Amino acid sequence: MTMRRFAGERLVGAQLTPGDKNKVVHAFDVDDTLTMKPDGFDNTGLTKDQFFDAAREFPADPAVVELAQMLASKGDRIAIATARPAARLEETMDWLNKNNIPYDQIMLSNGLEPSGVAKQEMLQRLQDDYKMVGTLFDDSPYNIEGAKMQGIDA
């Protein structure tokens, strides 16, 4: 499998399989969607870098992982759409692989715009590359509302 890296105005990422206008893609956020904070974890006072350093060890949410695996097994594509900064691409891919989370594409924010703006660009990119974006799985009400405004279930 060949990985193609890309960089846009508000995002960076990697595409493991090409877009396909005959396929549905589902987008998953990482933090607080695919990951679960350990009981008692408090990120109050942590910098973003400290939070992302700690997140390397967060467990995956088994129910969300199972959902992603089920969607992939029926032939749908999986995209990871996260506001994590671009510098966290490799470690995020490592975490996804370690937790057996399937993905065809991964997109991260370049940090120059608010995360919600970057997430909207990610969803637009997916709409351009696939038949449709089936669902956005995300913990942010702002991102969920933005997806609905684009006609995407969330």
Regions found by a protein language model. Give the residues of each.
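A short acidic-Thr-Gly-centered motif at the start of a beta-strand
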Residues: 14-21, 126-128
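Conserved Lys-Pro-Asp/Glu-containing loop-to-beta segment of HAD-superfamily phosphomonoesterases
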Residues: 119-142, 147
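Residues at the starts of beta-strands that form the adenosine-phosphate
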Residues: 77, 133, 153
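Non-Sec secretion/translocation targeting segments of pathogen effectors
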Residues: 1-18
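Alpha-helical substrate-recognition element adjacent to the catalytic core
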Residues: 19-114
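Short, conserved alpha-helical segments within structured domains
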Residues: 16, 88, 115-119, 139-140
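Short, aromatic/basic amphipathic alpha-helical patches
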Residues: 92-99, 126, 146-151
